[in-house]
Amino acid sequence: THRYLQEHSKIPLLVGANLEDGGCGIATDGTQYGKQMQIAATGDTEDAYRLGKVSCSEGAAVGCNWAFAPVVDIDRNWRNPITNVRTYGDDPDRVLACGVNYIKAAKEENVLVAIKHFPGDGCDEVDQHILTSVNSLSCEEWDATYGKIYSGLIQAGAQTVMVGHIAQPAYQKAYNPDFPDKLVPATLSPELLKGLLRKKLGFNGLIVTDSTCMVGFSCAMEREKAVPYAIEAGCDMFLFNKDLDEDYR
């Protein structure tokens, strides 16, 4: 269906899918290559290239041209319900190397990547489907871990970044000393998107939200306020809607 629509559309379609562990992210008969942690466990970062090759070639074959991958979070807390085996583990250097290799394969298949979930998941035990999660690292700790990863992947040519419903209080306070003492997700934080991602890291590509149907997005403020605020904060594109007419208004 995706391929048919892609081939017959007057305007080229942007078709995205979670191509994290194989073509199975979009094709019912696609290969399930392996979770990212399984890839990391081999000790060979070239396996991440092979994962990207299988995922993106099969995705492209059915009309997908945008991979919501790779996951570049760090498995700092094994109880985290979102990341865990979806990550390349707890070593930032390995996460970076695997991410670079996935991007290399995706480019060869003419598939865009969305590195996720900025500013970095894997620190706490919160499910963003239910609440806003927190990246609790100091600015210095973040720079040496998640910052190193995002900087490297941006330099490697990542075209888009998927922003999670994740607060990063240290940098939010650093960019705005008057920032309120409450959890505000990155999707609603110009401090993190315009300040940290755009200005400090120099990212000039597209910023897309994680699913805005998650409570982690709307628990900070009512959705009718959150939608325009996310745009003002720096989000270029929304993933999913709840009521299209209401969101558009």
Describe the role of every protein-language-model region.
Residues G43-C64, Y146, A226, A230:
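Alpha-helical scaffold segments that flank or form the walls of functional sites
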Residues V72-I82:
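Short, conserved phosphate-binding/catalytic loop or strand-edge motifs used
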Residues G16, A69-P70, K116-H117:
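Structural motif
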Residues T1-E7, G23-G25, D90-R249:
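Second-shell residues forming the walls of enzyme active-site clefts
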Residues Q32-G43, T87-G89:
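A charged helix-plus-loop insertion that forms the helical arch/lid used to bind
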Residues N65-D73, G234-F238:
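Divalent metal-dependent hydrolysis catalytic cores, especially in the metallo-beta-lactamase
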Residues T1-Q36:
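N-terminal hydrophobic targeting/anchoring segments and the immediately downstream early-domain regions
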Residues L13-V15, W66, V113, I207:
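Hydrophobic beta-strand scaffold residues
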